[in-house]
UniProtKB/Swiss-Prot annotation:
Its EC number is 7.1.1.2. It comes from Patiria pectinifera. The gene is ND6. This is NADH-ubiquinone oxidoreductase chain 6. Its main location: mitochondrion. It is a multi-pass membrane protein.
Length: 162
């Protein structure tokens, strides 16, 4: 049941990102997707990697997002097609409730290929996955530059009123 809940949270967060006109609700959806993704990673046995990912996300991307939305903020944020979101959310939640069987007892570790890799998590991150770590850092740098470039020339900025 916990996997259904995590997957429903991921789905609801991604629909919130997709349907939101304001960056505030988009960031809320991204936080919801990131938290549920890290929870899913930790349930599969990769808790150290999940912790590193959530610290990178909260420490890096949310700071960039707060800075960029402080420059170009809306006065009245809104979500487009709110009725569609409610219908879609109710359909997904009702599907999860109808498919839930309390007699199902599934262990994550009962799968043959899932192992607990907490003991080798940090060494894998820095030794064999060092290239991916550098690519992730480069992507964060590009996202910072893109956010700053997009918000630099905005005519309707909250700071211009000050």
């Amino acid at each position: 049941m916990i996997f259904y809940t995590v997957l429903v949270l991921m789905f609801l967060g991604s629909t919130l990102v997709f349907y939101s006109l304001s960056p505030y609700y988009g960031a809320l959806g991204l936080v919801l997707v990131a938290l549920s993704g890290c929870l899913l990673c930790s349930l599969l046995g990769f808790s150290f990697i999940a912790l590193v990912l959530i610290l990178i996300y909260v420490g890096g991307m949310l700071v960039v997002f707060v800075y960029s939305t402080a420059i170009s903020a809306e006065r009245y944020p809104s979500v487009s097609n709110f009725n569609e979101i409610l219908v879609l959310s109710s359909l997904v939640i009702s599907w999860g409730v109808l498919n839930f069987d309390p007699l199902i007892n599934v262990e994550v570790n009962s799968w043959g290929f899932v192992t607990n890799s907490d003991l080798v998590g940090a060494s894998n991150l820095y030794s064999s996955m060092g290239g991916y770590l550098l690519i992730g850092g480069y992507i964060l740098l590009v996202a910072l530059v893109v956010a700053l470039v997009l918000t630099y020339g905005s005519d309707y900025s909250i700071l211009k009123a000050l």
